[in-house]
Amino acid sequence: MAPAQASLLAKLDTQERVRDFLTNAVASGRASHAYLFLGAPGAGKLDAAWALAQAFLCEQDGCGSCDNCVRVARHTHPDVHYYTPESATGYLIAQTRELLDDVPLAPIRAKAKVYIIDRAEQLRANTANALLKTLEEPPEGVMFILLGTSADVMLPTIVSRCQCVPFRLVSPAVAAQAVSRATGQDPARCRMAVAVAGSPTRGIEFLKSAERQDARRQMVRAIDSLIAADEADVLSRAKSLIVAVKAPLAEVKSTQEKVLEQNADYLSRGALKQLEDRNKRELNARERSGIMEALASARTLMRDVLLTLQDEAADVVNEDVRDSIGRLAAATNVAGATRALEAVATAERNIARNVTPQLAIEVMLFDIRKALKCR
C-alpha cells in the first residue's frame, strides 16, 4: 500500500502546512525532540500527534502498513504514551513522576518512544518544573508532543523548550468535505460526524464505528423522550447511555489483553507494569473521549432545536433526526433550549473535573427535562 494512502500524516489534508512540515522533518531526520501543537479545539492537533508518532516510530518514515504503524493507528503501541490531566485542577505530580520514571526505560517494540501530553496548558508550575530538564535534553530516541490552545496560557518555560507548530481553525464545511472524500458518504452526514467527533480524522473513525453511532442515537432518543419521562425513565436512559458509550472499549480491552499475553514471557516485571499502566491510561482516555462525544451529540441536537425555534428553515447539523428536533422545538421555547444547552455545557465541565460520568449525565438529563418544560 502506498504511503500517501496509508500513513496518518498523509491523511491530514485539512492542515496541509502542518502535514508537509512534519513529513519533511521526519524524512530529513531533523525532527525535534519536543513539539508544541497550538490551536483551537477541533483543529486536529491530537490527530496530528498520533500521525507524527507513527512516522517517528516507523523505520520507513510512516509507511502505514508495518507493525509499528498499525499499532500506532489503533492507539495500541506500547511505546506511544498518551497523557491527559487526571484531576480537576490539572496534571498531578504523580503523573509527571510516572512519565519521568518511564522516559529512561528502553522501548518495548520500536526503536524510539513518543509521549503525547494533551491539554498541556494544565501543566502548572508544581508539575511542570520536574519535566523541564527532560524536555530540554531528553534521551536519544524520545519525542515529546504537547498539545495546547495558545502559547499565552502555557508556562513560558515549557514554550521555550518546544518547537511550536500552529494549527489553523478548519471550517465545518471544509472538514465535512474532507470526511466525505475519505468515506464517500453524504456531506450532510459527514458534517454531523465532524460536529460530534470533533475533527475530520475522528469523524471518519466515527462513521466506521457502529458502536459510536449507536451511542449518538441513544443520546438523541434519551433527550427526545425527556418531555414525557419520569425520574425512573431518566435514570434508566442515563444507565443505558453509559453502557453504549463503553461498548467500543471491549475491542480495545481485548487487543490490550492479547498484547500483554504475547509479551508476558520475555518482558521484565517492570516493563509489564509499564505496559499495564499505559493500557489503563488509554482506556481512561478512550472512555472520557466517548463521554465527551456523547455530550457533543446532545449539544449539537439542542443547538439545532434552538436554531429551529428561531427559524424553521434553519440549516441544522443533525439532518437525520429532524423529527426529534421538531418535537423538541414544539415542546419548548428559546429560553428552554438555551437552558438545555447550558445543562450540556455544565456536564462537559463536570467531566473535565472528573465527576463520575453516570452522575454527570443523570444531572444533565434532569436539567434538560426541567429546561424543556419551562414554557
Regions found by a protein language model. Name each.
Residues 1-126, 130-136:
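Clamp-loader machinery-focused feature within the broader ASCE/P-loop NTPase space
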Residues 116, 145-146:
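Walker B beta-strand of ABC/ABC-like P-loop ATPase nucleotide-binding domains
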Residues 1-54, 68-71, 140-142, 149-297, ...:
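Charged, glycine-rich active-site and insertion segments that engage polyanionic ligands
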